[in-house]
């Protein structure tokens, strides 16, 4: 539930507290399940 820079907290995304930055919008990262999936699986974790 804690953010790990540069990724935001999944919890904040799910409850609507996350506000996408200009770079997020430029990369077409929008609020929703897809962003949560990207946060969980989009880093070096995989």
Swiss-Prot record:
One of the protein's GO biological processes: chitin catabolic process
Residue ranges spanning the membrane: these are: none
Q: Which domain of life is it from?
A: Eukaryota
What top-tier enzyme class does this entry carry? hydrolase
Recorded catalytic reaction(s): these are: Random endo-hydrolysis of N-acetyl-beta-D-glucosaminide (1->4)-beta-linkages in chitin and chitodextrins
Under InterPro entries, the record lists: Glyco_hydro_19_cat (IPR000726), Lysozyme-like_dom_sf (IPR023346)
Q: What is its EC number?
A: 3.2.1.14
On induction, the UniProt comment says:
By glucan and P.megasperma elicitors.
State a single Gene Ontology molecular function.
chitin binding
Keywords, sorted A to Z: Carbohydrate metabolism, Chitin degradation, Chitin-binding, Glycosidase, Hydrolase, Plant defense, Polysaccharide degradation
Family named by the database record: Belongs to the glycosyl hydrolase 19 family. Chitinase class I subfamily.
Job of this protein = Defense against chitin-containing fungal and bacterial pathogens.
Name-wise, this protein is: Endochitinase 2
Organism annotation: Arachis hypogaea
């Amino acid at each position: 539930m804690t953010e790990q820079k540069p990724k935001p907290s999944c919890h904040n995304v799910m409850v609507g507290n996350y506000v996408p930055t200009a770079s997020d919008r430029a990369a077409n990262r929008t609020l929703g399940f897809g962003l949560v999936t990207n946060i969980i699986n989009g880093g070096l974790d995989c």
